[in-house]
């Protein structure tokens, strides 16, 4: 506090000493002031930090989030590319389908509502109305075209199941989205839309309040992958998953090529998330997927699959079979079959092959892990110590895995005597032997502590290489392998491509190789390897190696895709021949071709059952023991019967390979009897279709005497016909009957028929079937021949020009196989 004071010069105030309380108040004020300033600074710092965090650190993120709240980003699905065979036939395509869904919560006609005291709403279903709507929707869903409602069988299980699905879905009154059906075609979708529109219009004006209201049913566009031929080349084509992504086969290996690139449409949206009608939209167009054009030919594939299926059934093949037709010069695959397989339209369904698969899994339980285990994970055994199978296991995963596998590239096997072609090529190319090099076969041959025998323990005596290959002498090839030596043997084995993948453009080619390196090839290993019983390979590896032995020595990369095109058919990429290396010389290859032709020998050699009259065919059979599998009940090893053929033998164009894994033919295990006829059958149809060069001999006008085939097994019957230049057609109700003997044939035994006539064989009847004769007058001879062949008839053409007369009246009924004489002029 201040008080005034006086002095002589100035008038002023004198400071009075402050009290203690005053000094405390002053310090508090100063502290508060400082704290206030500090608080302002801290607050400012927080604000600045927050702004920095929002605008700088997370600025892009928040701006994107804000944009997302204002913009609607819609995906435009790219259409998946198609897959065509070599001639342009569609093997896989994509179609637009629809998912039909409903919003029961907004379908006021289906329920009555009551507001409760607590403001909640209780909805009560109207069963009669729900049943009426469900019935109408189900009829349209099952009609196929949305119009043929009367054709739907309402008593069928299919109808009852679909009806219940729709009814149950519509009954979920608090749900805003329920699926009624998927993969619905456009006609059905339009029919449902028409019904819903008409229904809502009628019930909007209803005077009866119980009939007033609406139903909310909508559709969503989606895509469906279609495979028009079903279980055809399934292991090659593969399939896509529910999202349209390739998961197996070509669909997987060419996923990025087929899929294309999705597009986008970006536009403003309103408060409820819908697009604003007048707002500007930015569209990034989708880029549809490219198409695959295969080297695979549907006709060649069908022939290979048909004869492979017959052989599997006829010989009770336990572990599936496979077949390959390949261009030996380019590696282009014309057919690749693994049977039994699956339908890529429904790959999860294995019921058609369930009995076969069940027997297979139980025959080799360790391969599929189906033994019972105790609480500690140990296998449970019976009193004899045998592992007990889990009969209640869910084998579905195993079953699908078996059927989905492409046997030609995923499974290893011992090639057996087919590999003798490779050993022979090694000997000739290395210079340690020639075709005239001889070794003696005494029926037994000792190597270290092992004793080797030939099939049937035969003693072949003194043989040159060609005779040894023809008689499939194990002992000759063991001695040849010894002369080649371990290091050189391995070098050739590697050069022929057996130590690496083939590089085929398919997924899942096994990376597991089972072979001996040079330093591991002891005396016994080398001996066993020389005739194909020590190193395991894939069927496709065997094919590419055989191709190299006959095409001049070049190892080519096999391929299934020939070219890639855009949606307009323009070629984007061509897949040409890829020669990896030359393995043997041209001269060595020529010798191999000669010896392989000697093996088939115009129907007289060891591979005679693959001979087809009119063609120069080389080949080699192989019957191998599967040393890595369980033995049969009789104690013998399970067998693999295989045969490889090349033609024309003097300058091969194609290779035909057949393999039957664990055939159970009570008569024989020999591949020359089991597999060679299958190759011959395939050749009999494929060679003329592809225009393969014949042996040059003109057989037109040649008359052939039909052999007596009644009582002969189908496999033997077709061999006889192929050798004589007669075609064959099996007429039966069940393909499994092909194991039975022929019960009837037409034309009959002893008939004189033109070369190339088709003989119709039956295994389930003692009389032939009949067919109606078409009218071919006025047609060209070639077209008339096609018409008669399609009707199951043979023909003889006399004269030239168009057909003027035919020996059987048009419309008449004759026995299938009858020869119709056509008079031309």
Segments predicted by a language model, with ranges:
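Periplasmic/cell-envelope proteins involved in peptidoglycan metabolism and beta-lactam response
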Residues: 1-390, 412, 487-494, 611-613, ...
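Ligand-recognition elements built from short beta-strands and adjacent flexible loops
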Residues: 575, 614, 628, 658-825
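Extracytoplasmic
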Residues: 76-79, 86, 93-97, 175, ...
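Sec-exported extracytoplasmic/periplasmic mature domains
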Residues: 138-146, 197, 241, 259, ...
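Acidic/histidine-enriched alpha-helical segments
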Residues: 149-165, 317-330, 440-444, 507-510, ...
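Soluble non-cytosolic domains of exported or imported proteins
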Residues: 78, 124-131, 182-186, 244-248, ...
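Beta-lactam-recognizing serine transpeptidase/beta-lactamase-like catalytic domain environment
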Residues: 6, 92, 98, 270-284, ...
């Amino acid at each position: 506090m201040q008080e005034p004071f006086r002095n002589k010069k100035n008038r002023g105030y004198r400071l009075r000493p402050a009290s203690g309380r005053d000094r405390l108040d002053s310090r508090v004020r100063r502290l508060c002031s400082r704290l206030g300033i500090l608080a302002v600074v801290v607050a400012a710092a927080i604000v600045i930090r927050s702004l920095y965090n929002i605008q700088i650190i997370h600025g892009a993120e928040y701006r994107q989030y804000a944009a997302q709240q204002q913009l609607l980003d819609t995906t435009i699905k790219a259409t998946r590319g198609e897959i065509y065979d070599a001639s342009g036939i569609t093997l896989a395509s994509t179609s637009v389908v629809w998912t039909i869904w409903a919003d029961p919560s907004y379908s006021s006609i289906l329920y009555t509502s009551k507001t409760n005291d607590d403001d909640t709403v209780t909805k009560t279903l109207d069963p009669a109305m729900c049943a009426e709507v469900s019935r109408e929707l189900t009829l349209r869903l099952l009609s196929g075209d949305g119009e043929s409602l009367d054709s739907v069988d309402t008593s069928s299980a299919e109808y009852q199941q679909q009806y219940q699905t729709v009814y149950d879905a519509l009954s979920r009154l608090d749900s805003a989205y329920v699926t009624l059906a998927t993969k619905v075609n456009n006609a059905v979708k339009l029919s449902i839309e028409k019904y819903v529109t008409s229904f809502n219009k009628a019930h909007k004006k209803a005077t009866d309040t119980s009939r007033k209201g609406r139903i909310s049913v909508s559709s969503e566009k989606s895509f469906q992958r279609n495979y028009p031929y079903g279980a055809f080349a399934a292991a090659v084509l593969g399939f896509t998953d529910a999202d349209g992504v390739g998961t197996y086969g070509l669909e997987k290996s060419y996923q990025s090529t087929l899929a294309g690139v999705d597009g986008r449409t970006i536009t403003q949206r309103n408060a409820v998330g819908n697009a604003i009608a007048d707002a500007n939209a930015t569209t990034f167009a989708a880029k549809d997927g490219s198409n695959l054009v295969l080297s695979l030919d549907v006709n060649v594939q069908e022939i290979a699959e048909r004869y492979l299926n017959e052989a599997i059934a006829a010989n009770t093949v336990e572990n599936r079979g496979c077949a390959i037709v390949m261009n030996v010069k380019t590696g282009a695959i014309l057919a690749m079959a693994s049977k039994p397989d699956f339908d890529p339209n429904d790959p999860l369904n294995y019921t058609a092959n369930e009995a076969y698969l069940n027997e297979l899994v139980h025959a080799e339980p360790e391969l599929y892990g189906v033994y019972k285990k105790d609480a500690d994970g140990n296998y449970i055994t019976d009193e004899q110590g045998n592992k007990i199978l889990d009969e209640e296991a869910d084998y579905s995963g195993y079953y699908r895995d078996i059927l989905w596998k492409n046997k030609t590239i995923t499974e290893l096997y011992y090639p057996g005597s087919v590999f003798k072609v490779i050993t022979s090529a090694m000997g000739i190319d290395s210079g340690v032997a020639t075709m005239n090099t001889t070794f003696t076969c005494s029926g037994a041959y000792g190597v270290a502590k092992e004793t080797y025998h030939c099939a049937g323990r035969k003693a072949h005596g003194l043989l040159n290489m060609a005779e040894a290959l023809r008689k499939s002498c194990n002992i000759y090839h063991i001695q040849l392998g010894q002369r080649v030596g371990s290091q050189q043997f391995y070098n050739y084995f590697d050069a022929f491509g057996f130590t690496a993948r083939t590089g085929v453009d398919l997924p899942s080619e096994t990376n597991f190789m089972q072979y001996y390196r040079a330093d591991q090839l002891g005396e016994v290993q080398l001996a066993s390897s020389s005739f194909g019983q020590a190193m395991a390979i894939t069927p496709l590896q065997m094919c590419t190696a055989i191709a190299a032995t006959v095409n001049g020595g070049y190892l080519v990369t096999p391929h299934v895709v020939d070219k890639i095109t855009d949606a307009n058919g323009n070629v984007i990429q061509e897949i040409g021949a890829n020669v990896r290396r030359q393995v043997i010389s041209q001269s060595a290859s020529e010798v191999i071709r000669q010896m392989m032709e000697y093996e088939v020998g115009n129907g007289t050699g060891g591979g005679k059952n693959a001979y087809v009259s009119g063609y120069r065919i080389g080949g080699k059979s192989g019957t191998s023991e599967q040393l890595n599998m369980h033995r049969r009940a009789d104690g013998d090893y399970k067998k693999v019967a295989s045969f490889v053929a090349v033609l024309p033998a003097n300058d091969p164009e194609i290779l035909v390979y057949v393999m039957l894994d664990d055939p159970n033919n009570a008569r024989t295990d020999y591949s020359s009897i089991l597999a060679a006829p299958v190759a011959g059958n395939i050749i009999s149809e494929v060679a003329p279709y592809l225009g393969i060069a014949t042996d040059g001999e003109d057989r037109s006008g040649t008359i052939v005497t039909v052999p007596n085939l009644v009582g002969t097994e189908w496999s033997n019957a077709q061999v006889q016909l192929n050798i004589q230049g007669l075609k064959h057609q099996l007429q039966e109700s069940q393909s499994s009957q092909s194991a039975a003997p022929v019960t009837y044939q037409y034309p009959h035994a002893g008939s004189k028929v033109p070369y190339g006539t088709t003989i119709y064989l039956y295994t389930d009847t003692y009389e032939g079937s009949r067919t109606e004769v078409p009218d071919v007058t006025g047609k060209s001879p070639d077209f008339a021949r096609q018409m008669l062949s399609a009707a199951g008839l043979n023909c003889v053409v006399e004269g030239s020009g168009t057909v003027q007369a035919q020996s059987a009246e048009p419309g008449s009924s004759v026995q299938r196989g009858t020869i119709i004489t056509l008079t031309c002029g």
